[in-house]
C-alpha cells in the first residue's frame, strides 16, 4: 500500500471498530480517529446526552457533518458509528474517499461486548437483543453495499483482525 489512503471501518456496535482501528492505525503508522469521539468533542457532551436532547435525528445530522469533514482527511483509520451507513450521503462519502472495511459479528458477540456499556443509547431498553436484531436487519445490507472488504471479528483478537486487514490491503 504505497499511498496512504483512508481506511474506514463500518459495522454494528460491538464489532470492534474502535479497538481494531487503533491496532490497524498503529501497524500502518496512520492516525486513528473515532467519529463518535469527534462528535462528543464538538458537542461538548456525550453521545447519550445528544440522543436524549436532540433525538436520533439530531445525532445523525451531527454525525453527517463530522463524516463530511473526516472523510476529507488523508491517511486516517476512521471508526464510524454503527448507524453512519443509514445516510446515503455518508455511504457515498465513505466509498469515494477511502477503503471501506465491514467488521462483521454475531448478535451474541455484540451482546457480550456491549452488556455493561451505558454509553449506547439504542441499547438502553428491556430487550437489547431485539434491538440488535432489528438494527442488523436494517443495517447489514448497507454495510455490505458500502464495503470493499468484509472481516468477521467474532472469535479473534483485535490484533489478529488488524493483521488480516493489513494483508488484504497489501494484496489489493
Curated annotation (Swiss-Prot):
GO cellular component, one term: cytosol
Subcellular locations according to the entry: Cytoplasm
Keyword Chaperone among record annotations: no
Ligand binding (substrate): 36, 60, 82, 139
Pfam families in the cross-refs: SKI
Superkingdom of origin organism: Bacteria
Residues noted as binding Mg(2+) in the record, renumbered to the chain: 18
GO BP of this protein: amino acid biosynthetic process; aromatic amino acid family biosynthetic process; chorismate biosynthetic process
Binding partners and assembly: Monomer.
Name of the protein: Shikimate kinase
Upper classification of the organism: Bacteria, Pseudomonadati, Pseudomonadota, Gammaproteobacteria, Vibrionales
Amino acid at each position: 500500500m504505497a499511498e496512504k489512503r483512508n481506511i474506514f471501518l463500518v459495522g454494528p456496535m460491538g464489532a470492534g471498530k474502535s479497538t481494531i482501528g487503533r491496532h490497524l492505525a498503529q501497524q500502518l503508522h496512520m492516525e486513528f480517529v473515532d467519529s463518535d469521539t469527534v462528535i462528543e468533542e464538538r458537542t461538548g457532551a456525550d453521545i447519550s446526552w445528544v440522543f436524549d436532547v436532540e433525538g436520533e435525528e439530531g445525532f445523525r445530522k451531527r454525525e453527517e457533518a463530522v463524516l463530511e469533514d473526516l472523510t476529507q482527511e488523508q491517511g486516517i483509520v476512521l471508526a464510524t458509528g454503527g448507524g453512519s451507513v443509514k445516510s446515503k450521503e455518508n455511504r457515498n462519502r465513505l466509498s469515494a474517499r477511502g477503503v471501506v472495511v465491514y467488521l462483521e459479528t454475531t448478535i451474541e458477540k455484540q451482546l457480550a461486548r456491549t452488556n455493561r456499556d451505558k454509553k449506547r443509547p439504542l441499547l438502553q431498553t428491556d430487550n437489547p437483543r431485539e434491538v440488535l436484531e432489528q438494527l442488523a436487519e436494517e443495517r447489514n445490507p448497507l454495510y455490505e453495499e458500502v464495503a470493499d472488504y468484509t472481516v468477521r471479528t467474532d472469535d479473534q483478537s483485535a490484533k489478529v483482525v488488524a493483521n488480516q486487514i493489513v494483508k488484504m490491503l497489501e494484496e489489493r
